[in-house]
Regions:
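Glycine-rich phosphate- or other oxyanion-binding loops that anchor nucleotides, phosphorylated ligands
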Residues: 8-11, 35-246
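Basic/polar N-terminal segments that are highly enriched at the extreme N-terminus
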Residues: 1-6
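Short, conserved "active-site rim" segments that organize catalytic pockets and cofactor/ligand binding
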Residues: 8-32, 50
Length: 246
């Protein structure tokens, strides 16, 4: 385990890709009270809050392995998974944010339902706090189930099938795997995912456009939304993070 100060509330912010987490350091530098430590964590002594971050790679296996490693090293009080997702609800628009309440793997289908992985829902009090903070930040947020699978969802037909069977608000490739490991380790978990596309027949085109913007040095503000929401909520409701394990 690292030398993280357990007198602080420990928030772990994780992502699949570096670009989904790059904004964290820039954002904390512009906020009062934050200092970077020699362990590359971020501490706010007044708030008694510490943030650790980790990029674990794309897909469920990378997410599960990275989450287990993170928990063993840092013993966080709460894990927030930020990054992109495909929006599944009809009112969704690019840049809106999904606030996860519960998580399901759509490509895991054992014959007996009691063999399904055990995944705890996100703490309701923190989901509500994130929803309130989203409103204050003028971020359009939706709370609900997030579906996960080891594939890029870019088919309207497949999207509709997932909606019919699981009723999620968003689809990604990691959240349910992180949730499964966090549940096994008794660590509360929430996913905050910004809609990069609508997970339909136009999704591949949108992904290529985002990639081009990034490679040509253009900022993509929608990547910043989950980090702003996570940090602001943690600062405002730091006591809730400590209470999630009580």
């Amino acid at each position: 385990m690292s030398d993280i100060n357990k007198k602080n509330a420990i928030l772990a912010i994780v992502s699949a890709l570096p670009e989904e987490l790059n904004f964290l350091e820039e954002y904390l530098q512009d906020r009062d009270g934050w200092k970077k430590t020699k362990e590359n964590t971020y501490v706010n002594a007044k708030q008694r809050l510490e943030i650790v971050s980790k990029v674990f790679g794309v897909g469920k296996v990378s997410a599960a392995y990275g989450t287990a490693d993170l928990i063993n090293e840092n013993d966080p009080d709460l894990i927030i998974n930020v990054g992109y997702a495909g929006g599944l609800i009809k009112e969704a628009a690019k840049g809106d944010v999904a606030i996860g309440t519960d998580y399901v793997q759509v490509d895991f289908a054992p014959y007996f339902k009691n063999n399904l992985p055990q995944t705890a829902p996100s703490p309701g009090v923190l989901v509500d706090a994130l929803e309130k903070e989203a409103s204050k930040l003028n971020i359009t947020g939706y709370k609900g189930r997030i579906a996960t699978g080891d594939f890029f969802l870019h088919s309207t037909d497949q999207k509709n099938k997932i909606l019919e069977e699981y009723s999620p608000i968003a689809f990604d490739m990691e959240s349910a795997a992180v949730a499964q490991v966090a549940t096994a380790k008794n660590v509360p978990f929430i996913a905050l995912r910004t809609f990069s596309d609508l997970a339909d027949d136009t999704a591949a085109e949108q992904a290529l456009a985002n990639k081009h913007d990034r490679e040509t040095g253009q900022r993509i503000p929608i990547e910043h939304q989950p980090i702003k929401l996570a940090v602001n909520t943690a600062e405002r409701y730091v006591d809730l993070i400590k209470r999630t394990l009580s």
